[in-house]
Amino acid sequence: MRVVILGSGRGSNAEAILKAEQEGRLGGARVVQIFSDQPAARILELGARFGVPAQFLDPGPFKTKFDEAGETRYLETLQACQPGLIVLAGFMRILKPRFVGTFPQTIINLHPSLLPCFPGLDAIGQAWRRGVKVTGRDPQSDQRLPPPPARRSRESVHPGWPWWFPTRV
């Protein structure tokens, strides 16, 4: 299966996926491309490290969504990659139904909270400031919020943990 990763930041989830591929733990799936909507994102450095093409792809002028031209640019570029799976690994853009509908049952979003709690930016920080006792991660593969419970990952929050620790559990 051909995997394309989209990310906006440092790429810790992308790195974990690439390491799993290197170790033969992806069942024959292979990452064929990394794209970022941020020209200086550290996720782009992973390409050279793991031998995967990585490039900035202009999303348009908005901070958290695509303009029409940017969405079209992404859709056409992704279609050319012929992905069997698109992983949103810290990709900080809201995808419209047109985008998701172009790749039905192909996109998975790794979101660092139990949705619908703490959507959007800084989900882990939001949960920490709220003082939650349980947090987790939701892999989304469609537009449903929250995702089906079988896909959720729950973690207890322990006193004394730094705010970012649940991202490493």
Question: Model regions: which residues?
Answer:
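One-carbon transfer enzymes
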Residues: M1-V169
